[in-house]
Amino acid sequence: MSNDNQLDKKSQAWSALFSEPMSELVKRYTASVDFDQRLWRADIDGSLAHAEMLAAQGILTAEDHAAIVRGMAQVVAEIESGAFEWKLDLEDVHLNIEARLTQLVGDAGKRLHTGRSRNDQVATDVRLWLRGEIDAIGALLSALQRALVDVAEPNAEVILPGFTHLQVAQPVSFGHHLLAYVEMFARDAERLLDVRRRVNRLPLGAAALAGTSYPLDRERVARTLGFDGVCQNSLDAVSDRDFAIEFTAAASLCMVHVSRLSEELILWMSQSFGFIDLADRFCTGSSIMPQKKNPDVPELARGKTGRVVGHLMALITLMKGQPLAYNKDNQEDKEPLFDTVDTLKDTLRIFAELVGGISVKPEAMERAALKGYATATDLADYLVKKGLPFRDAHEVVAHAVKTAIAQGRDLSELPLPALQAFHPAITDDVHAALTLRGSLDARQVLGGTAPAQVRFQIARHRTRLGS
C-alpha cells in the first residue's frame, strides 16, 4: 500500500463524513498547531508508551510496533533539527505528528490511534508537559530562595525600619525581612508539589469519553510514563482541567509574592528611601532625563503579575459552563497555561540574579528607623516588665512620643528626668531598651528578628535547600 499521507489528502481526519471542505477562515480560527506544537515531546512520549502497551496486549503486531518506534525516532530528529513541517490543515500537534509518522511507516502509523482519542491524548500531553514544567519551576524557586538567603546572611545585623501601614513601626533585621520572602517562596514550592500530585494521573485509555472496548492496560502506560496512577472516570479524565487551574492559581500566588518583593525594591531604591541600589543591568534610563535610573525589571514583574492572575480568571471562566465531557472550549486552556509557565519561569530566573545584585545602604536604613520612634513598643514592654499592665504602659508611652515629637527628638534622646515624668518606674536602665540595637537584640523569640534568630533561620533554610 502507498505510504502517501491520507490525512493530507482528506485535509482532516474526519473528512469522509462531510460534503464540503472546511473554510480557510474556520481552519485558521480552530487550528491550534501554532501554539500546541510545544507539546510535541510529550505527544511522542505518550504515543510510544501507548504503542508499546498495544503491542504487549496483542493489539499491534511486533512489526507495526517496531515501525512506529523507528518512525517516531525520525519525527523527533526532524523536529529537533527544524526540518519538520507543521501544517495548518492538520490542525494540531497530534495530527501533524501522526500524519508524518504515517508518511514514514505506512499503515502502522494509522494503527497507532487504536483505542485512543485526541481527547484523552491531549489531556495526557498537557499533564506530561506540565509535570516537567513544575519540576523546572521548583528548581528555579529553590535558586531564588538561595539567592535571598545569600543576601540575608551578611545583613543579619543591619537595621531596617519595619513598617505597618507604610509607617515606621519597629526596627527589624534586613536579613530577617528578606527571609520573609524565603518563607513565601517555600510555600509556593510546597503548593506546586501538591498540585503535581494531581497533575500526575494518566487520562490515556479514557478515549473520547466512555473508555474503549480494546483490552488496554492503562496501568502499564502509567508506569511507563511515570504517572502515579490513572484517572478513574473516563468522563472526568477527558474533561478535567482542574489541574491547569490549580497550577495557574499556585503560579498566580507565586507571582503575587514576586510583585510584593518588587514593590519593596522599587520603594527602597527610590530617592525618598535610598535603602538599596539595583545593579545597572536590571535598570534603564530615560530618553529625556539623563539623571534617571529606573527599576524596570521589578516594575515589569509587578505588571506581569496581573497578566498571570488574568490567565487564572480566564481558565476558571473557560470551565464554568461546560457540560461533560470534552468541548472545543478546552482548546483555549493552552495559551493561558503556556504563557503562565513562560512568565513565571522567566521571572524567577531573572529575580534570582537580580536579588544577588542588590547593594545595601545600612546607614540610610538606620537613619530612617530613627525617624519613626521605632522603639516606642520597647518602652512599653520595659514598663510592663516593671509591673504596669500593657494598656497603661501603652498610654504612658503615647504621651512620651507626643512630647518627643514636639521637641523634635527621638525617645532615646529624652533625658532620664523627662522620661521619669511620664512614670516613676522608669530608671536609668531605660536607655538600653530604647536603642535600635537593643530593640533588635531583645527579640529572641523563635521566628523573631534578633540577629541570632536570623542566623538560626538562615542555617535552617540552607539545610532545607541543600546549600
Curated annotation (Swiss-Prot):
The keyword Amino-acid biosynthesis applies. One of its GO terms (cellular component) is cytosol. Its EC number is 4.3.2.1. GO terms for molecular function: argininosuccinate lyase activity. It catalyses: 2-(N(omega)-L-arginino)succinate = fumarate + L-arginine. This is Argininosuccinate lyase. It comes from Methylibium petroleiphilum (strain ATCC BAA-1232 / LMG 22953 / PM1). It is found in: Cytoplasm. PROSITE patterns: FUMARATE_LYASES.
